[in-house]
Amino acid sequence: MRDSNHRSLTSNKPIVTITSTVYDRRALDINSSIPLINSLNYLTYLTSNSSKVRETVANDGALERLVSILRSCHLSLFELLDLDLENFNEHENIKDLWKEKRLALCAWKWTLTFQCLVLTGTRGTEQIRKKVVMSGVLSVLVTVLDNYLLYHKNYDFIKDQTMTFDFKGITTETMYKFMRKDENETYQQYIEFITGQDKLKLSTDKNFLNERLVAPSMTIPTDFSDIWGRFADLASNFEPDQERHDDDIDIDSEVESENFDAHKNFFSQPDINRPTISTPREFFLGRIVPKQDDVIWSLQLLAFVSKYTYMKSTLQNVELVESLSFRSMAYKIKQRISEENDLEEQERDVTVKLSSLYPYLSKNPENNSKVKALDTSKMDPFFKELEELSNRCQQEEQNEICNNHCPVLNLFERYRVPKPSDDNAYGKDKERINLRKKISDNFERRWSYDKMKKELTNIVYKNKVLTNVVNIFPLVEKYTVSAENTHDVIYWSSVIMRNSCRKNEILGVRQCANFSCGKWEDFPRQFAKCRRCKRTKYCSRKCQLKAWGYHRYWCHEVGSSHMRSTNTTTGVNTPNEPSSLNATATTAADVSNSTSTFTPNISTTVPDEISNRDENSIPE
């Protein structure tokens, strides 16, 4: 395949792609979507069947590149508002096709990259799984699980409650009219507030389309834009011949003009029967909506990673990916709702105070204007003080304006002619050195790092620490609820929760299973075990009662059929021998201490290559 847009300008040549028999790391460093999707398609097949490829991927930096691809699978605010398609407003069909193609390519990159990471982690060795964790994939997994609860369940797991508004409906017209800051706020400004401002300011230039500074490629979306522009110019300049007076010629010219107008409006008319581009994932405000497959893949990878106790501290401190997460949107909506509630309370308080001061306001509306003419001596002392303060501030502002705009009587009044001296340069340097020394001494006298307060304030701690760092285990615990999830989701989430109860292999102590507590044992066997499952430990009866609300969904009695099935299975597939990915699990990640090689239910047949065509061409 050939493409001129390569990350490395020195390697601007025909693109290297991954095939079913050859793995090449350079194929992952391209920006063009179609060749990259082809390479990811074959890489999914290779990582599922070849242990050598999995080991190579873990050591050549491909894991970090795959994670960066996942983090980039979203639409910027520039693309979300369709500002890159402003010149194609008259061609609705082409505009819709381009939007569908852009979403489809982004979704396919997400799906295939996710599969590559999951297959590498679930089928790899312990060292490979450690590399997978170090690549930063945990942030993506937590974001997927959190987004699924926010979007599909309308549930905030951090506050452990259902949200007071419909998250899916924040883009509707009704929600926009209810949530907008004022009547002057447009829908575009409302979307900008929800999704967050871009670091690059949105341009109002009409020719900004040709620059494409924010778009992934530096070309116009389609090669037909110039043709359509000429076609429109031809339509504006087209006029029938005015010199012909023959009736037949007039009739023919009218027919030709009608046909021409019909062809002119061809691109602007919506085509109901046109084929649509299939997209494996939906998008909401430019961000991918996770499906149940994404949840299962995330839980499977976490199940194999969480069985290593030395990774528990890493799993308990994971940051969400801001560009992919829905949590920032939900937080801004809650903030807007709280601001409106505060304004309503303030208006209510002011109304109550005015009604108490002037009881006749509500009874005689026609006499309300008399309040303005009340004598200041009869006003409340607090309001009188506020009025005096306001008058004083206005007077100070007027005085400051007058002082700043005072006319200059003599233009050379402040001009100073330097005296001729041989030591002028030396004197300036000496003054500069003295000034620098004075500033340094003043800084050292007033500032000391030893005496500086290093504690974070409550506001900074809540906004910068608590909101960004997430504990995986209480999030996964929400997926163990049997009434809300499928069998696969319940199984893998239960595996992760049982892995969280493992004791530290170095110290031999366990952590309290109440995640809001998180206390560790001072010595082995200090805490009491759950009498039913004999796995979880609690530091007190209070913690056990508090955690039972969700622990009861994954608490299996010792000797039950579930425990026997997980303890008696011994089959382990060797990494060197490819096995069918559609087979069921032969070992549980929470029981086996060896390298488990269960693979998710992902198709690994040799993929068909996508048609070799330019990324900017119109999809058929």
From Swiss-Prot:
InterPro entries with a match to the protein in the record: MYND-type_zinc_finger (IPR051664), Znf_MYND (IPR002893)
GO terms (BP aspect): establishment or maintenance of cell polarity; protein ubiquitination; ubiquitin-dependent protein catabolic process; ubiquitin-dependent protein catabolic process via the N-end rule pathway
Ranges of Polar residues composition bias in the record: 563-606
SUPFAM superfamilies xref list: HIT/MYND zinc finger-like (SSF144232)
UniProt region (Disordered), positions on chain: 563-620
Keywords: Cytoplasm, Metal-binding, Ubl conjugation pathway, Zinc, Zinc-finger
Subcellular location as annotated: Cytoplasm
Start-end of Basic and acidic residues biased regions: 610-620
Zinc finger (MYND-type) residue numbers: 514-555
GO function term, MF aspect, one: zinc ion binding
Residues that hold Zn(2+) according to the record: C530, C533, H551, C555
Record's GO cellular component terms: cytoplasm; MUB1-RAD6-UBR2 ubiquitin ligase complex
Main function: Involved in the determination of the onset of polarized growth. Required for the ubiquitin-dependent degradation of RPN4. Cooperates with UBR2 to transfer ubiquitin from RAD6 to RPN4.
UniProt domain comment: The MYND-type zinc finger is essential for the ubiquitin-dependent degradation of RPN4.
Summary of subunit composition and partner proteins: Interacts with UBR2 and RPN4.
Similarity section: Belongs to the MUB1/samB family.
Note: Present with 125 molecules/cell in log phase SD medium.
Protein name: MYND-type zinc finger protein MUB1
Species name: Saccharomyces cerevisiae (strain ATCC 204508 / S288c)
